[in-house]
Amino acid sequence: NVLVPPCSGCYSQSGNTCYYDVYKCPS
């Protein structure tokens, strides 16, 4: 299995992918 790099900063993990979390970094 391919390991996903840890999601940090404004990113959250969803399943096996990282996505930009607007709740962590509101504009």
From Swiss-Prot:
The organism named in the record is Stomphia coccinea (Spotted swimming anemone)
Residues that the record marks as modified (Hydroxyproline) are: 6
**Protein name per Swiss-Prot or TrEMBL:** AnmTX Sco 9a-1
Q: Which family does it belong to?
A: Belongs to the sea anemone BBH family.
Per its UniProt entry, which superkingdom is the organism in? Eukaryota
Disulfide pattern: 7-18, 10-25
Keywords (alphabetical) are:
Disulfide bond, Hydroxylation
- Keyword set includes Repeat: no
* Function recorded in the entry: Has analgesic and anti-inflammatory activity in vivo. At a dose of 0.1 and 1 mg/kg, exhibits anti-inflammatory activity by reducing the volume of edema during 24 h better than the nonsteroidal anti-inflammatory drug, Diclofenac, at dose of 1 mg/kg in a mouse model of acute local lambda-carrageenan-induced inflammation. At a dose of 1 mg/kg, reduces the content of tumor necrosis factor-alpha (TNF-alpha). Demonstrates a significant analgesic effect on acute pain sensitivity in the carrageenan-induced thermal hyperalgesia model at doses of 0.1 and 1 mg/kg.
